């Protein structure tokens, strides 16, 4: 990429001293130290105190930097005792320093860093005080105590004298905001979908309590290298000192800044850095994505530039872009001789990456530092004294961003084999050779760790981590981090480590869960969501013709961003939905601040009428890009999302290829590994297991293994038994049914039973018999089965003594109820009497035995009789036994007609 040489600012231009956001620069003579122009200051003599009170104070060491320092500052009015401890967590393992040779070859060095010289601490006697200093070249940094802020810097031509400049003496240099603006007091929590809010709140407290780690790379451009006297080591130390201050600012938010690399463009700029901050920002972000990310893994990158940006801007960063490949970064103008100035600006721009908006009066933010003492870091208008704390609004904005899914990369604990400056028990980091580290013995509250030796106490398995409870590891499958949105994946304890696995989320391009969109960097962006953000509840995207007509103009109100010449770019037809967002409905005016302008466009239709398109032009400050543009990752067509203001196919992410390896039983995560369903095992979800992935741990707890195995064994046994039954089915059928009586056969046989009463005689067995026989197997109705009945002839032709056996119901009444059967002229008039004595009176005359035995299945008999009604004359009807009611006559009881059996 061609280099754009930095333009030298005129000598009369002042250093801009305010934070990011539109800030006015006070004018000062170039070349004079700002510290010489700020009015009164105190001269302090510094000495290093020894633990032995009898040893006099020593000078601050220039090369040897102990782990712990106690420094005495002797002032004219009082003495201050500073307790300092080296910031061991500032530098991660694998930290690199990169510079370039004259031919452009990059040189990356990984040093042992025995010259660690960056400290955090407090003023003795004031627990609320804050100290952030470096001792690389004398004492330099900030001191906050008794609600006052001081800046400490070495004096020239001396080794033990320092300037202690109070904040009050710096109020004559004040930056003003070039535009009174604010994104709004409407946070993202207010406009996110209700279901997502409820799911996010369940994990809100857990997320906020967890420590977040920003793996940061700081780059100095060529102009910054020149401003620091072309001293490579001086530039590197300055960048690390800036990171040390920023880490101190963010600690109250439970965020740690971990420096993974510094880079100095000591030969030429690697991308175009000009006085246009917008162009410089996007050039740097493009270089980061294409060049820096492939060779150095990190979460965020910030450029410290020696170029004076035009206008009032001293920094710029995209809003809520942390962890994204395209926009996680910012540019900062080094506007002060002290590294503290650039550190505050970097903290401000990093806040925008976190989703923090400017603090304004209309938001009603609470700040514990008064404006005359610096105020808060996200103030849009500030200057000396530098702000060093965050407001309540910033905390709320951060919480809302985390709930929405921003910052998926922040929950990964950086690898620390040996902290910056060497291993030390008591620094709070578990380093190589340590089992635990809970800090110094006087501050350790961990009952599982021995603070003196950094070893576990007896019977303790672990001491730290979300998967450690009561000094023991939680069982595998225990949830340790829930999903925060529709594109996030939960994490579970593995049972082998005390820390929760690194955060993972759905692969870019994967459809959102329950939302019409695609996941991108762990967030589901949609046009509808952005319309609600701009216009409030009830807003929705406008028809496609609005995007096409408005964004083809290439002006401030309809465009696809800016081109390399900082001119508004027209949108191609295919990219129209990736330009300025077009909405309908919602509030009468944008809800995102007083500087938001409504742009309404009416498009006539051929059939009559007009389509109203509502866009916005929002000026949120020089340090924030236009929020009215469609966000990266938003769905612009089926199978496509917006990337770099272009509507591109999701296949560029490789999501389909990745999903194929999961066999339809899981989804692909951002590390291109399968996250399997609960009963399938990673890595490919093709075997039974406990779900999850190799990155996030098992979904189900392993203590269910015994139950699962038992169920599987039972199923296998049942299958084996069923197979044996199938093979021996004929033998079993003969054994079960050849010598057994069916239920209806038992009804026909004479067995003891309850004597039926008169009123129920005709229906006692009607309904049960019918239901039973309807389910009977058809083969029981064959003639062979009918002839095999053993008790039927005895029951009909030779009845037992009625006095010994209770009266049974007549089987034919089950099939042929009297109320449905027409009576024959000579048939019996009444049913059998209830008293057995009646049958004794007719014992002289016996009815003729039936010509055929009764069938085995009386219910099926009806259909058989129906088909057999056509008979030869004189053929006797089978199965109907006359029911005598009086002494039988001498003649045979007439047979009923054929119609008597028709139903």
Swiss-Prot record:
What are the boundaries of the region Disordered? Answer: 753-790, 819-903
Might you give the EC number(s) for this enzyme?
Answer: 3.4.24.-
The UniProt entry, under CDD domains, shows: ZnMc_adamalysin_II_like
Q: Which SMART domains match?
A: ACR, DISIN
Q: Which Pfam families match?
A: ADAM_CR, Disintegrin, Pep_M12B_propep, Reprolysin
Task: Tell me which tissues or organs this protein is expressed in.
Answer: Expressed during early developing mesenchymal cells that give rise to skeletal muscle, bones and visceral organs. Not expressed in adult normal muscle but expressed in regenerating muscle.
Which keywords describe this protein according to UniProt? Cell adhesion, Cleavage on pair of basic residues, Disulfide bond, EGF-like domain, Glycoprotein, Hydrolase, Membrane, Metal-binding, Metalloprotease, Phosphoprotein, Protease, SH3-binding, Signal, Transmembrane, Transmembrane helix, Zinc, Zymogen
GO annotation, biological process = cell adhesion; proteolysis
Q: Which residues lie on this side of the membrane: Extracellular?
A: 206-706
S-S pairs: 323-409, 365-393, 367-376, 480-500, 658-668, 662-674, 676-685
The Phosphotyrosine modification is found at 901
Q: Does the keyword Transmembrane apply?
A: yes
For the EGF-like domain, which residue ranges apply?
654-686
Domain named Peptidase M12B is located at 212-414
Motif (Cysteine switch) positions are 175-182
Q: Where is this motif: SH3-binding?
A: 824-830, 830-837, 846-852, 852-858, 881-887
Group of enzyme by EC: hydrolase
Stretches that traverse the bilayer: 707-727
The signal peptide stretch is 1-31
Cofactor binding notes? Binds 1 zinc ion per subunit.
Residues with an annotated glycan are: 112, 147, 157, 182, 185, 450, 649
> What else is noted?
Marker of skeletal muscle regeneration.
Protein name, UniProt field: Disintegrin and metalloproteinase domain-containing protein 12
| Source organism per UniProt | Mus musculus
**What broad taxonomic lineage does this protein's source fall under?**
Eukaryota, Metazoa, Chordata, Craniata, Vertebrata
